[in-house]
Amino acid sequence: MHWLSYYKKWVPQENYYYASEHTGFMANPDGRSEGTYSKYASLDDKTDGFHWYMAYVKFGVARATSDASQEIRSGHLTRDEGIALVKRYDGEFPRRYLPQICEYLGMTE
């Protein structure tokens, strides 16, 4: 398996700007993704929020931590900004697709 990041530095925010400028890619029309502050990643994955929420339950870190860490390393956020975003969004329960996830798993809310 080959990943694009093997060949090109992967910086999500810069990739978003490139895609929106050159391909017409549009950010999430509903605003940010649940559990984080970004509005341009995992837009087509209804299970992603639950994956990250369970990571928060199990490990104490989730999507906002991952996103902020990448953006701090790439110079798009300061450490203090990242900490504030993580405190605000990590652990947020993903309600948007809860009915569909429950139906898929054969569960009730």
Where are these regions (language model features)?
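Nucleotide-activated chemistry modules centered on ATP-dependent adenylation/adenylyltransferase
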Residues: 1-109
